[in-house]
Design a protein with these regions (language model features):
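Gly/Gly-Pro- and Ser/Thr-rich, intrinsically disordered tail segments characteristic of DNA damage-repair
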Residues: 1-226
Length: 229
């Protein structure tokens, strides 16, 4: 059993930690030399800002609408990331750091002690209390399903940022709503090939014939399908 702990809009949230007045404001973080947008909050997304937008093209309009931009500060982001990972290492027996803002937790033994959704909320609370960073937690029997759960935790506000898809009916319901290109490891080219075979959702992918997939695609996709089942 695994949990994926993923920080919400990590770079932008790091900046907000020291500027609580920006909690509901549109915020973007810019690349080196302020070239383009590398992180943005949902409020910025609601203004039509997108990842990699050139700053010189959007600066005037963004500021007119009350947006705030920060130059990237990777030393700060690394420090906050280290603090978050240290908290997780106190909560779970094994932590695999996947990126600066994501980590997989091995939940072996934890399910015997407490409800897994409750554990996810403990992670949320501890990280918010000690760092000020909002996170979401996806829980599932495999790492790929933990990623699926994280997608659901982000997509659906009723989850309040924590979703456990251990129960088969829960993950089937979610996978039927999840576009196949949202699956971990499905890039643009693979998505196009899958769509050509009418595989448009995560559930469709999970039902593909393993033998045919091995012949037409790759062992990596075979492994992904196995992790979805």
């Amino acid at each position: 059993m695994f949990a994926l702990v993923d920080c919400n809009s990590f770079y932008a949230s790091c900046e907000r930690i020291f500027r609580p007045d920006l909690r509901t404001k549109p915020v973007v973080v810019l690349s080196n030399n302020d070239g383009c947008v590398v992180a943005l909050t949902k409020e910025a997304k609601n203004l039509g800002i997108k990842m990699c937008d050139p700053w010189f093209k959007i600066e005037k309009t963004f500021k007119q609408k009350g947006g705030i931009a920060f130059s990237s500060n990777y030393e700060l982001y690394g420090d906050i990331s280290s603090r978050i990972m240290s908290i997780l290492e106190e909560l779970a027996p094994k932590v695999e750091i996947y990126s600066i803002d994501e980590a997989f937790l091995d939940l072996t033994g934890i399910a015997n002690c407490m409800d897994l959704e409750e554990f996810g909320r403990v992670c949320q609370k501890q990280i918010m209390q000690y760092t000020g960073m909002p996170v979401r937690v996806g829980i599932g029997p495999t790492k790929t399903l933990a990623k699926v759960a994280s997608y659901g935790a982000k997509r659906y506000p009723t989850t309040q940022g924590v979703l456990d898809v251990t129960a088969l009916h829960k993950r089937i319901k979610l996978m039927k709503l999840m576009p196949v290109n949202e699956i971990w490891g499905v890039g643009r080219r693979l998505n196009k090939r899958l769509l050509s075979q009418r595989v448009s959702t995560a559930f469709n992918l999970s039902q593909m014939d393993i033998g045919q997939v091995r012949k037409q695609f790759s062992i990596m996709l075979v492994n992904t399908i196995r992790e979805l089942r």
